[in-house]
Amino acid sequence: MVSVFLSSLLLSVATAQVYSPAQQIDVQSSLLSDPNKVAGKTYDYIIAGGGLTGLTVAAKLSENPKIKVLVIEKGFYESNDGAIIEDANAYGQIFGTTVDQNYLTVPLINNRTSSIKSGKGLGGSTLINGDSWTRPDKVQIDSWEKVFGMEGWNWDTMFEYMKKAELARAPTDAQIAAGHYFNATCHGFNGTIHSGPRDNGQPWSPIMKALMNTTSALGIPTQQDFLCGHPRGVSMIYNNLDENQVRADAGRAWVLPNYQRPNLKIMTGQTVGKVLFNQTASGPKAVGVNFGTNKAVNFDVYAKHEVLLAAGSAISPLILEYSGIGLKSVLDAANVTQLVDLPVGLNMQDQTTTTVSSRTNAAGTGQGQAVFFANFTEVFGDYTPQARELLNTKLDQWAEETVARGGHNNVTALKIQYENYRDWLLEEDVAYAELFMDTSGKINFDLWDLIPFTRGSVHILSSDPYLWQYANDPKFFLNELDLLGQAAASKLARELSTKGAMAQYFAGETIPGNNLAADANLSQWSDYVIQNFRPNWHAVSSCSMMAKELGGVVDATAKVYGTQGLRVVDGSIPPTQVSSHVMTIFYGMALKVADAILADYAKSA
C-alpha cells in the first residue's frame, strides 16, 4: 500500500495548473475559424483531426519553433456542453449533442443500425468517453513486433511512452481502503495527462470490496494496479481527472498550455476531405489536403513535409479512400481513381457491450466503480471445454468466412491474427472480458468481450467527401465465439450480483430482469444479447499497422505503404484489440510516432 507520506508527495507532484476563464477566452480567440486565413498557405505538417492523437502529435512537433504545424478539426473548442464535458460523473449525457459525431452503422445482426459514439471537437473522444485509465497486457503489445513485424513496437518501449504521457496522482488512504491500489513504478509523474481516482466526495459503497471478496474466494486476484502490464482480476481503476475532479481531456492537456505558440495553428469547424498528391517516380507524394464544409465550399492548403491523418478509426480510412488509396473494388464503385492498392477499411475490430443491472439496499449505497478483467475460463465457466474446442478447430473456417464477408482480404494473414488471439486466451492468461461495475445506488455491470474474432469494414460510397456517404459495418457477432463470449460474460455478471459477499446488498435485478429467465442457459443469453447489445466504441485496425503482406496499411513509423509524406497516427492503426481501455495506448502511440516524425525531419533539415 502507498504510505501517507508517499501519497502526499505524489499529490504535490501532480498538482495541475489552473486556467482562468480569461485564459479560456484567449484560447478561443487564438483559434482559426476563417478558412481563407490558411487556404493556399504552406505548413511543415498538416494534421487532419484535433482529437487525442492529433493534438498530442501537434504539441510534440511544435515544441520546435522552426516547425510550422496546422491542425484542422471538424468540431470546436469546448462547447455549450462544457459543463457536461468537465464532469466525468455526467458520462452519457453528452451523447447526441454537438460534441458527438454519432456515426451510424449499416443494419446489423438484429436488423437495426447502431450509433458509433465519437467525439467532435478539440480533444476528440476524450471529451465524451468514460475517462478510464488502464493499460493492456504485455504479451499483446509484444505481439505487434513478434507477430506483425513492427520493429520497436513492444511492451518495454511502449510502457515508457505511456508513462511519459502520464501525470499520476496516487490514491489517498481512504481511496485505498475503498478498493484502489497503486504501484508507483507503473506510473509516470512528469507528463501532461492527469490520472487519478474518481471521487465525488460522497461515502464509498462497500460493494467494491464485496465484489473483491466474492471473486477472491474463487481464487481470482484482487486490488491490483491495472497499469502494470497484466490487467487481471478485480480492482478499482484510475481516470483522466485532475485533482479537482475535472475531465483532463486532450484539449486541456495539449491546447491550453501551447496555444500561444506562433508556429501552431488550429483551424476549427472544417473537415479534411482528401489528401492532395503529386506523382513522383517513387509513387504519390502527399503535398497538402483539401478541406471545407461541402463540395461548393472547400479549400486547399499545403504541407512541406507531411500530411498526418488523425481523424479516428471510422474516418481516416475514408479520407484515404477519397484520396485514391484503397481497394480497387471499393474505389471503382465510388468513382474514385486508384493511386495505391491497399486494404484500407478492412480488419476493423470493435467490441460489444451489454448491461446487467440490479437495485441495491440501503447498506450498499455510496459511490465507486470496480472492474473485473476476467480470463477465458472465468468467463465461460462450465462452457470452457466447448469454447476451447472452437478455438482449437475453427480458425481456418472463421478466416475463410471473414474474407468471404469482406472483413479481410487474405485468409492466410487473418489466420495468423486468429492464432495470436487463441494463444493469448489459452496460454497467456490474457483478460478476455471486462465487467465494469458502477455503484451509486445500484449494482450496474457494463461488460464486453475484449478480444473479438469478428472483422468489420468501413468504406466510402461516393466520391464526394463532404456528403458523408459511407458504410460502417462492424459485422458484430458474425463470429460464433464472439456471441458466446458476450453471452457468457453477461451470464457471469448476473451470477456475481447475487454471489458470496454481494448477496447482502442485492435488492432485485432490473436488467435483464423479467426479460430473461433466472436460470437462462448460454443459448438463451445469446438470443438476449443479439437484441440488446450496443457497440463499445473502441474500434481499431481499420488502417492496420503491420507488415504489408499481412494486410498492413501503414508501416512501423505509421507511413502509408506506397506513398511519401503521408502517415496515419490515430486509433485506426493498432493491429490488435487489447485488454484495456484504449487511451493509454493512443497517447503512448502518438508520442512514439511523433518521435519518428521528428527523426525524419532532422534528417531533412
Swiss-Prot record:
Residues 1-16 form the signal peptide. GO terms for molecular function: beta-D-glucose oxidase activity; flavin adenine dinucleotide binding. One of its GO terms (cellular component) is extracellular region. Disulfide bonds join C186-C228. One of its GO terms (biological process) is secondary metabolite biosynthetic process. Glycans are attached at N111, N183, N190, N213, N278, N335, N375, N410, N521. FAD binds at L52, T53, E73, S125, N129, G130, S132, V272, G571, M583. Its EC number is 1.1.3.4. It is found in: Secreted; Secreted, Cell wall; Cytoplasm; Secreted, Extracellular space, Extracellular matrix. PROSITE patterns: GMC_OXRED_1 (PS00623), GMC_OXRED_2 (PS00624). The active site is at H538. Homodimer. Glucose oxidase catalyzes the oxidation of beta-D-glucose to D-glucono-delta-lactone and hydrogen peroxide in the presence of molecular oxygen. Belongs to the GMC oxidoreductase family. This is Glucose oxidase. It comes from Talaromyces variabilis. The gene is gox.
